[in-house]
């Protein structure tokens, strides 16, 4: 393996105190060789240098790599292309001399590395994404953008034109209310009748409010109109007549004074009938006198007889 070769090549590179401290056995035969990867134009050289640097940092108590590195530039990414073998070799040499290959290559972390970088122009290059993100951030944050964001948006936008939002994020333009609302007058044409046509139609309307099918065909052929136009004219004329009659009725009701309501009907009273003579009942004395013939009216005696009246002189 290439790592074993580097360890056996230069023994003076690693201090003996560190190499043999703690009874650590780091013989080359104890290491398991990793699987070989296909050649990607200098990528295996960088991987071997990184493995050697990790081994060196594990054995020596030297200072570790810094936690954060500066943001890589777009020009530095060209070293990972197939044509960047020279830059990778320089990074390996820098790592063998005690430096950090990652710092020499100029990237902060392995996550920032893009192994499938294409140098030629591609229609779906990820460089177009920051323009959409910058436009979205400007929409969420209404404050003035910083100079760095403005410069990045102008640099990444194609043709030097600044794009605030992506096409699929743009809000559709609202049409004006006048263009959305349509009336019948604008959609359909309006027929203008001549004086002769109106006169003949008025004559027919006064003769009959509802025209027959036969008369409608004859009138349409005479006036040079279609049957549909004649039918619609009669419909409009009847609506106009109803409107005129309603207006006249309202005017008459306003001119006449309001009449008081009639009194409610009273229930019928019973009428008195014709007077009839009722016979008076007879007294007991008169009935007795009437029953005795030749008797003189008088008073009954104690014996039950009739007392004759006495005449005094």
Curated annotation (Swiss-Prot):
> Which organs or tissues contain this protein?
Detected in small intestine, colon and pancreas.
Q: Does the keyword Cell membrane apply?
A: no
Bias category Pro residues: which stretches?
A: 257-273
Phosphoprotein listed as a keyword:
yes
Q: Name one GO molecular function term.
A: DNA-binding transcription factor activity
* Top-level taxon of the source organism: Eukaryota
Which UniProt key words apply to this protein?
Answer: Activator, Developmental protein, DNA-binding, Homeobox, Nucleus, Phosphoprotein, Transcription, Transcription regulation, Ubl conjugation
Where is the motif (4S motif)?
283-295
InterPro entries (UniProt xref): Caudal_activation_dom (IPR006820), Caudal_homeobox (IPR047152), HD (IPR001356), HD_metazoa (IPR020479), Homeobox_CS (IPR017970), Homeodomain-like_sf (IPR009057), HTH_motif (IPR000047)
Q: Name one Pfam family in it.
A: Homeodomain
- Composition bias, Low complexity: 274-313
Region Interaction with DNA, as annotated, extends over 186-216
Subcellular location, principal: nucleus
Q: Which SMART domains match?
A: HOX
Which residues carry the post-translational modification Phosphoserine, per the record?
Answer: 60, 283
User: What biological function has been recorded for the protein in this entry?
Assistant: Transcription factor which regulates the transcription of multiple genes expressed in the intestinal epithelium. Binds to the promoter of the intestinal sucrase-isomaltase SI and activates SI transcription. Binds to the DNA sequence 5'-ATAAAAACTTAT-3' in the promoter region of VDR and activates VDR transcription. Binds to and activates transcription of LPH. Activates transcription of CLDN2 and intestinal mucin MUC2. Binds to the 5'-AATTTTTTACAACACCT-3' DNA sequence in the promoter region of CA1 and activates CA1 transcription.
The family this protein is said to belong to: Belongs to the Caudal homeobox family.
Report the protein name in the record.
Answer: Homeobox protein CDX-2
What gene does this protein come from?
CDX2
